[in-house]
A protein has these predicted regions:
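Glycine-rich phosphate-binding loop used to anchor ATP phosphates in small-molecule kinases
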Residues: 60-127
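The conserved Walker
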Residues: 9
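A glycine- and Lys/Arg-enriched "phosphate-lid" helix/loop adjacent to the NTP-binding pocket
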Residues: 100, 104-172, 185-189
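Hydrophobic positions on the alpha1 helix immediately C-terminal to the Walker A/P-loop
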Residues: 16
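Hydrophobic anchor at the beta1->P-loop junction of P-loop NTPases
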Residues: 5
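Conserved lysine of the Walker
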Residues: 13
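NTP-dependent small-molecule kinase module
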Residues: 152-155, 162-222
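Conserved substrate/cofactor phosphate-moiety recognition/catalytic segment
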Residues: 21-67
């Protein structure tokens, strides 16, 4: 089972991934975590060429997405051959790239279409790679008092308005996924409660329930 965990800046994505990686093994489900590719490239000295030409920027986005898909495929292949039910947790997924390339204007949409054409990809196929998508809304929407532009991710830094706009682009890119869960900051009194909304959604998914059943059957057989 592959799940994309995404969202806006300071939405709680990193904390949610850590929490899931700790809790799922208690249910008999092994966890593999795919790091956010932007952060991985940043750490490798291949940061986004913000001052480069548009062609250089688009090339970076293309190679980042290609690397992400390859890493996802590798982890899923390893998980498929494991005797233990395994969940692959993605720190962002393929459609996050759309949010950062197609930034709302015609030029951005054209750039995204160029990127898809170069890779031989289409949005429907990219979406279908994931069994579920969890979007944790930035605290810049609905919990502004908790928002800090100095996020845990050194690769990016956004003010409130930028974080709000980015969050909306990301959720728009993903929202047509049939198993899309939007976890907002409304009607929650704490981040723990926000996280419970995300985990409850995940634990109700048919694919997850099948994994738990498989693990139980294997335990009985032993």
């Amino acid at each position: 089972m592959m799940v994309a965990v995404t969202g806006g800046p300071c939405g709680g994505k990193t904390t949610a991934l850590v929490e899931l990686a700790e809790e799922l093994p208690k249910l008999g489900v092994a966890v593999m975590r795919c790091p956010e590719l932007s952060t991985l490239l940043f750490g490798a000295g291949a940061a986004f060429p913000g001052l480069g030409t548009r062609a250089e920027q688009l090339a970076w986005d293309y190679h980042k997405l290609r690397a992400q898909l390859a890493l996802e495929d590798t982890l899923c292949s390893i998980a498929a051959e494991s005797a233990q039910p395994t969940m692959v947790l993605m720190d962002r997924g393929a459609l996050d790239s759309k949010a950062f390339v197609a930034t709302g204007d015609e030029a951005g949409q054209h750039a995204w279409e160029q990127l898809l054409e170069r890779g031989g990809w289409d949005e429907a196929s990219l979406l279908s790679r994931y069994d579920a998508v969890i979007h944790l809304v930035t605290t810049a929407i609905g919990a502004e008092e908790h928002y800090s532009g100095a996020t845990s991710n050194a690769a990016r830094r956004e003010d409130v308005a930028e974080a709000q706009a980015q969050d909306l682009r990301i959720r728009t890119a993903w929202q047509s996924h049939p198993k899309f869960c939007l976890v907002s900051n409304e009607h929650v009194s704490s981040f723990d409660e926000k996280l419970r909304h995300a985990t409850t959604f995940l634990y109700q998914q048919e694919h997850f329930l099948d994994m738990i059943t498989t693990q139980s059957d294997q335990t009985i057989e032993r």
